Curated annotation (Swiss-Prot):
GO molecular function per UniProt: nucleic acid binding
Listed Pfam families: UPF0102 (PF02021)
Name the record gives this protein: UPF0102 protein Sde_3146
InterPro entries with a match to the protein in the record: Restrct_endonuc-II-like, tRNA_endonuc-like_dom_sf, UPF0102_YraN-like
Coiled-coil intervals: none
Family classification: Belongs to the UPF0102 family.
Length: 118
C-alpha cells in the first residue's frame, strides 16, 4: 500500500473513532460508485451523515478543511445519492455532509460543512 493511502486510512480510522466517541454509528467506510467516493457514512440518531476526512501534517499549505473543493463536494453528493438509491431503507432519513479535518494532530469536526445546493 502506498504511504499516502496508508496515511489516509489511518486518518479515516481516527476520524471514525472520534465520531463514534461523539455518539455516531458507523454504517460504511470508503463507499465507491462511478461518480465519487465517501470516506465515512455514519448515523447520528435518525440522520445520515456523509463524512469527508481530510488530513494535513501541517497547515503550512492551507487547512485540511479548506482542501474540500466544490468539485470534491459535488462528487461526494453524487456518491451520497447513489448510496441512497442502493439503500432505499435509509433514503427517507435526513442527510448532512460533514468534514473531519485532521491538521497537525488536531481533529476538527465540521457539521453541515456543505449542502446539496453548494
Amino acid at each position: 500500500m502506498a504511504k499516502h493511502n496508508e496515511t489516509g486510512t489511518q486518518a479515516e480510522i481516527l476520524a471514525e473513532q472520534h465520531l463514534v466517541s461523539q455518539g455516531l454509528t458507523p454504517l460504511a467506510r470508503n463507499y465507491h460508485c462511478k461518480g465519487g467516493e465517501i470516506d465515512l457514512i455514519m448515523q447520528q440518531q435518525r440522520a445520515l451523515v456523509f463524512v469527508e476526512v481530510r488530513f494535513r501534517k501541517s497547515a503550512a499549505f492551507g487547512s485540511a478543511a479548506a482542501s474540500v473543493t466544490r468539485s470534491k463536494q459535488q462528487k461526494i453528493v453524487t456518491a451520497a445519492q447513489h448510496f441512497l438509491m442502493d439503500n432505499s431503507k435509509l433514503a427517507n432519513l435526513p442527510c448532512r455532509f460533514d468534514v473531519v479535518a485532521i491538521t497537525a494532530g488536531q481533529i476538527e469536526w465540521i457539521e453541515n460543512a456543505f449542502t446539496l445546493n453548494e
